[in-house]
Amino acid sequence: MLKITVNNGFRNLRAGDVYDLTDYTQLKSVCVVGENGCGKSSLFQALRGMKNDAATSSLYESDFKALASNITVEHDYEKIFYFDRVKDNGTDFQVAYDASGFIESGGFYTKSKSHGESSMVYIDKFLSKIIPNIVEDKTLIVLDEADAGFSLTKQKQFANLVYHLSLVKKADVIVISHNPFFICSSILAYDFTKKKAVSASDYIREVTGFNISKVETV
């Protein structure tokens, strides 16, 4: 189960707001959608500050912990892991221990790669750390805009990766995304502003006026 209550308003989140994803996480993978600035990342950063089983030396970790005091969380997960495209993209590995490990992985050579290629390197590094620690049906993985900048090929790889984590590794996966391809390939879209599940195609049509059929991953 996963239910987050905002006790003190912060950023664009209001005191008293309740985000109950319990019924939706039973589907194993959920895509959280909403406008820029509606509070999606802020809410899950606060959750990250409360429980993160892959804590790093990122300079942002103390900020996340400060946000955690604004929420109350009910969950039954033994492990919770996070990947944030902006906060975990390699630029904050400023402690020697983390830096040495990153060099060994080839991570610092990403400056010669495209944005999408670099992002995939960071995601692969993140997953190599957490996959051995996944507890079946008791692990939550939050991927925050990890698919930004991906080509269609990379988007397909990312969608299949999410399904692998949820269906093979038996982890619950929450993906925050603005990517129409991933939204339409999702089992479910959770409208953050409306706090309820929506049809992916209906959501895209409501926001853009475009009709997009559901994407079937292979």
Q: What does each model-identified segment do?
A:
Residues 28-32, 139-143, 171-173:
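Generic beta-sheet signal
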Residues 31, 41-107:
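ABC ATPase nucleotide-binding domain signature region
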